[in-house]
Amino acid sequence: VVGGAFWVTDTGNRRVLGWQGGIPEPDQPADVVLGQPDAESRSENRGGPAGPDTFRWPHDVTGREDLLLVADAGDHRVLGWTPQPDADRGADLLLGQPDFGGAEEWPYGPHTNDRFRFPYAVCLDRAQDGSERLAVADTANNRILLWDGMPSLGAGGADYVLAQPDFASNGENRWTAVQRDTLCWPYGLSLRGDTLAVADSGNNRVMLWRRT
């Protein structure tokens, strides 16, 4: 549930389904279908190139009352709608690609703080004072990216990186052994208050960080 709506990433059908009244009754059809022109279609990126209203592998959702974020892992990006959509429409916000038509997998080499390789999870947390933090599991780069505040369209890259020595590095377990500050294919995460939990799938463990 994000805000008052219940959202489901229907990954294999390349769409996100939304129920505006919260948890639906059994067999209740969705009120909103994002990523496809109708409830019967299921093509990757609507059968064409990536755009602001398409998905390849939508895998996770987060947000708040007036914002929905979707981790579109297959297009190596995070899409955002503000306010939350009440019908199929293009996204307003974009992270991980230079424009809405981009879906390039960054080549395996030195990386940056504003590109992803298969971001499978995203989480936005708001503190009692109204401040926000955003976390993205940049899965194939074996790292977690963090922003102080919700970045806007065209804003700079992440403020912090976990599990790598710098933004350019992306090795599995830092190309060393499994350690307390390494990750191998982080696949899920949850950010609440001062605690970040990460499903470190390649190392068969869950890692916890506490902000000090």
Question: For each predicted feature, which ranges?
Answer:
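Signature of short aromatic-glycine-proline-rich micro-motifs recurring in repeat-based ectodomains
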Residues: 1-3, 46-64, 108-125, 174-194
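Conserved beta-propeller blade signature
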Residues: 5-8, 67-70, 133-136, 195-198
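Short loop/turn segments immediately following the C-termini of beta-strands
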Residues: 11-12, 21, 73-74, 83, ...
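Beta-rich catalytic cores
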Residues: 12, 54-57, 74, 90, ...
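Structural signal for beta-propeller blades
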Residues: 14-16, 76-78, 142-144, 204-206
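Short loop/turn segments immediately following beta-strands, especially the blade-tip
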Residues: 19-28, 81-89, 147-156, 209-212
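Surface-exposed loop and turn segments in beta-propeller and other repeat-based domains
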Residues: 28-52, 90-113, 157-180
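Blade-level signature of beta-propeller repeat domains, shared across WD40, Kelch, NHL, RCC1
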Residues: 142, 187-212
